[in-house]
Amino acid sequence: MTNFRKTHPLMKILNNSFIDLPAPSNISSWWNFGSLLGLCLVIQILTGLFLAMHYTSDTMTAFSSVTHICRDVNYGWLIRYLHANGASMFFICLFLHVGRGLYYGSYLFLETWNIGVLLLFAVMATAFMGYVLPWGQMSFWGATVITNLLSAIPYIGSDLVEWIWGGFSVDKATLTRFFAFHFILPFIIAALAGVHLLFLHETGSNNPSGIPSDADKIPFHPYYTIKDILGVLLLILVLTSLVLFSPDLLGDPDNYTPANPLNTPPHIKPEWYFLFAYAILRSIPNKLGGVLALVLSILILALMPFLHTAKQRSMMFRPFSQCLFWILVADLITLTWIGGQPVEHPYVIIGQLASILYFLLILVLMPITSLLENNMLKW
């Protein structure tokens, strides 16, 4: 009798994806983040579902419903902080996952990479709308500032903003629709993640050397299931430590003040994971230019396959490209720091230089360095 997992139509899909999947024998812990992102998504959907049972998307009661969750609902504080800090863990895993893809040339799997870029946009949209829901000061003003950016679009801009708001300002209609979108998007993300995996399994995984590994494959289970469990344990350790010891470490104190349209906070800023893009937006004095730079700072990832000039796929054996990669990482950390600072003298110019360097590295320096490395190898 043939094995049940290999014959049953549903089990066969799971078997070919997680059990008998041929995987390269040399993939490192940098390949753990896909499964960790899946875990983050499950945590977010479950905690979000339980939060939605007690939350009300009305401007009059949204803030107090979140207070009610934290004070009166059994373990409501735990669910709320797991959800808030789970988003931070999600983005940490996302950035590391994308960074891994850039370093090892995984972007040459075009369909997988493009679905990944789409997933990144979807997760960012979901996180932004989720941040608006508690209806604190930073929720309200963050929503006002970011949605207002669309007014920079020529001709249709102002109409588009009012259409998204559902009125002439961020109000009840905006909050209700943001809640609806915030609820539905994670399920769309889950479906997209399935498509992401589908395309990945068409080609098989990349590996640190960037060399095809068809001659040397091992089954996913038990080798990488065990390896993934280590990552899972570390993720849970970090998340529970954050939630139980300093749940507000990554949040903004302003969001503990109910939204007040008549009182603008001194420094409007998004959550930490958007600060790099926010710094790029602020570094350009022109509104439309800033919005374009903001979108391009993420969309530039879709250009990566076309900017790949190296003869080798991975950066493993390309020390000069490695050097530029780590400069890019340092640049993004600098932008993240700048995004959280007020708009005054030293910070403005640092932000502008860091923004120029970001685009310069990706569009000019890295492709040229790759060509130089090709010549050094006499290829």
Curated annotation (Swiss-Prot):
Amino-acid positions noted as binding a ubiquinone in the UniProt annotation, renumbered to this chain: 201
Cofactor comment: Binds 2 heme b groups non-covalently.
Record field: transmembrane: 33-53, 77-98, 113-133, 178-198, 226-246, 288-308, 320-340, 347-367
Subcellular location: Mitochondrion inner membrane
Record SUPFAM superfamilies: a domain/subunit of cytochrome bc1 complex (Ubiquinol-cytochrome c reductase) (SSF81648), Transmembrane di-heme cytochromes (SSF81342)
Binding-site residues, heme b b566: 97, 196
Key words of the record: Electron transport, Heme, Iron, Membrane, Metal-binding, Mitochondrion, Mitochondrion inner membrane, Respiratory chain, Transmembrane, Transmembrane helix, Transport, Ubiquinone
Biological process (GO), any one: mitochondrial electron transport, ubiquinol to cytochrome c
Keyword Transmembrane in record: yes
Positions annotated to bind heme b b562: 83, 182
CDD domains (UniProt xref): cytochrome_b_C, Cytochrome_b_N
Cofactor or coenzyme needed: heme b
GO molecular function per UniProt: metal ion binding; ubiquinol-cytochrome-c reductase activity
Membrane topology: Multi-pass membrane protein
GO CC aspect terms: mitochondrial inner membrane; respiratory chain complex III
Pfam families: Cytochrom_B_C, Cytochrome_B
Complex formation: The cytochrome bc1 complex contains 11 subunits: 3 respiratory subunits (MT-CYB, CYC1 and UQCRFS1), 2 core proteins (UQCRC1 and UQCRC2) and 6 low-molecular weight proteins (UQCRH/QCR6, UQCRB/QCR7, UQCRQ/QCR8, UQCR10/QCR9, UQCR11/QCR10 and a cleavage product of UQCRFS1). This cytochrome bc1 complex then forms a dimer.
Family: Belongs to the cytochrome b family.
Cross-referenced PANTHER family: CYTOCHROME B
Record-given protein name: Cytochrome b
Organism, scientific name: Neomys fodiens
Protein encoded by which gene: MT-CYB
